Each structure stands twice: as C-alpha cells, then as structure tokens.
Amino acid sequence: MTIPTVIDADGRGWDIYSRLLKDRIIVIGTNFNDAMASSIIAQLLLLQAEDPKKDIHIYINSGGGSVTAGLAIFDTINMMSCDVNTYCMGMCASMATVILSAGTKGKRNILKNAHTMVHQVSGGAQGTAADVERTVEFMYSLRKRLNVILANSTGNTVKQMEKYCDRDYYMSAEESVEFGLVDNIL
C-alpha cells in the first residue's frame, strides 16, 4: 500500500499518518497483531508525553484480530491521563469493538452508516493433548475477561455479554448506542 503524503503550509512534506499524529489523531485501519499494537501504543505514549491533558482521537475501521495485541492497546488507553475519543468508521468488529468502547465515556462515537460486531474469542490449537487443553483453558479465560471488559464499558451485565457474544452479533450505529458501546452518532 502506498502511503499518501501531504504538504503543510510551511512546504514541509509528511506521510499522512505522521501529519495526523501531529494533530493527535491515530488511525487503526488494519487487523490487530503485535506489530500493529506496538505502533499504536507508541503513538499513544508519545501523545501522552507531549501533552498529558489534551484529547487524543482514534479512528477505527477494523475487523479485529489478536486479542492479546488488542488488550495491550486497551490497557494503554485506560492508563492515559487525557481523554481518548474513539470513532467507528465502516466496521469495528471483535477486538476493534473493544477498543472503540475503551474511549472516554461521552466521547465514543460512530458514523451513521458504520456497524459494530461482538462475538466470543476464536482460535485454534495444536500439539499434545495437554498443550491443546491449556490453550482451550486460556481461550476460556480470555472470553471471560472480554465479557467483563465489555460489561464494564457498556453497562450490560456479564451474563448479558455472554449471551450477546455467544455468536457474531452485528449492530447498526443506533443499536451500538443502545447497546452502550458508543455514546454519539456523527
């Protein structure tokens, strides 16, 4: 993918993501993995160091991905001293929905034609029977942890989250507000 460049008023050229970062805007437009999470975390930490009181804005269009990578971003957002505004554009699914819900209450946004989706953890395992069993136990613990996180973020109960996340559960912008994932439709 070619990354576009922009020229600012001073004639300086920037790649578009660096220029957006200057305005405290982070864009998540890929699935979650460790390298992507490290990049997002580094951007959050940089913005926090530059001004611990000024809002950060995260725009998300992602199908989700690695739960552990997403949880690293989630925890970093929650340790920020500044408010974090989140925006769903297109689709926030799976781990991307968790990140969307991590924004500061009242500052979690969704565009009017965007959608969200929650579901239970999925993955695979191979190896010895003992290794597979341990992986399954780990997946159950992640599922339980994510249900608690989403319950806290949305105001739903853990039991409700277990029900909603049993299968893919898609929501429109309006349904996402009703569900408690976001606060505003833009």
Predicted regions and their residues:
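Terminal-region recognition feature
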Residues: M1-L186
